Structures are given as structure tokens and as C-alpha cells.
Design a protein with these regions (language model features):
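Short beta-strands within extracellular/lumenal beta-sheet-rich domains
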Residues: 1-17, 28-30, 70-73, 107
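Extracellular hydrophilic low-complexity repeat tracts enriched in serine/threonine
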Residues: 2, 6, 13, 38-41, ...
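Short, exposed beta-strand/loop patches in secreted or surface proteins that constitute
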Residues: 10, 34-36, 77-79
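Short, surface-exposed linear patches
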Residues: 18, 40-43
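Short edge beta-strand/loop segments characteristic of extracellular beta-sandwich folds
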Residues: 19-23
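Terminal, low-complexity interaction segments
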Residues: 27, 42-113
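Short, surface-exposed beta-strand/strand-loop-strand elements in extracellular ectodomains
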Residues: 29-40
């Protein structure tokens, strides 16, 4: 099943950077899509994630081997408004429906600066 998460209003305006760590589920790959709503845009709109043996159905995910080289992403946010929100999904349609072509992901360390 594809996952979808939407933040609250960001409360910042203008152009910013969005950085985070993300991996796909053990033995899988995934594409993580990011969308800006309520004003603004993001580039790129998706990133490819590698599978990590620590990303399983058994949290906490203490055994994920995070890598700055393969798992850390920085995207450009443009023209944000104070009410802009971010939506993260493993579905290009941003729906939480069963879809065998999408993968699961673990996202952490999200920063806007």
C-alpha cells in the first residue's frame, strides 16, 4: 500500500531547501514523490530510494544503515507562502491505495532551511 503524509503549514515564505534522509523497504526499491500545496513548487518532484535491510515491519528502525551519499536528498522549494504544505508519497497520484508498483519508504531528518 502506498503511503501519504502531509505536513502542517510550513510558516515560511520564499525560496528554501528541503533536505531529508529516506530509504525503501528491505529488498525493494521505491520512488518518493514530494508535492507543495497552497503556494509554491518543488524540484525535483521525486527521488529514487534504495532498499535497506533495516527498513522492515518491525520498528524501531535502529538498524537502518543511513548513508549521506545514497540516502540524503536536497530539493529546492520555490515561491512558498506561509500556508504552503508538503506532501510525501510513494504514489505518483498521492493516494493511499493498494498499488503493487509502489514501494514503502522510511523518511526522517526532514529540514527546511
Amino acid at each position: 500500500k502506498a503511503g501519504v503524509f502531509t505536513t502542517g503549514a510550513l510558516g515560511v515564505t520564499g525560496n528554501k531547501k528541503l533536505s531529508f534522509y529516506a530509504v525503501a523497504w528491505k529488498g525493494k526499491s521505491a520512488k518518493l514523490y514530494v508535492r507543495v500545496d497552497n503556494g509554491g513548487s518543488v524540484s525535483p518532484v521525486s527521488v529514487d530510494l534504495r532498499g535497506d535491510d533495516g527498513a522492515t515491519g518491525n520498528p524501531p528502525f535502529k538498524t537502518i544503515a543511513w548513508s549521506d551519499e545514497t540516502d540524503y536528498f536536497t530539493l529546492e522549494l520555490s515561491d512558498l507562502t506561509a500556508s504552503s504544505t508538503l506532501t510525501f508519497s510513494t504514489s505518483s497520484t498521492f493516494t493511499a491505495a493498494s498499488d503493487s508498483s509502489t514501494g514503502r519508504a522510511v523518511v526522517c531528518g526532514v529540514q527546511i532551511y
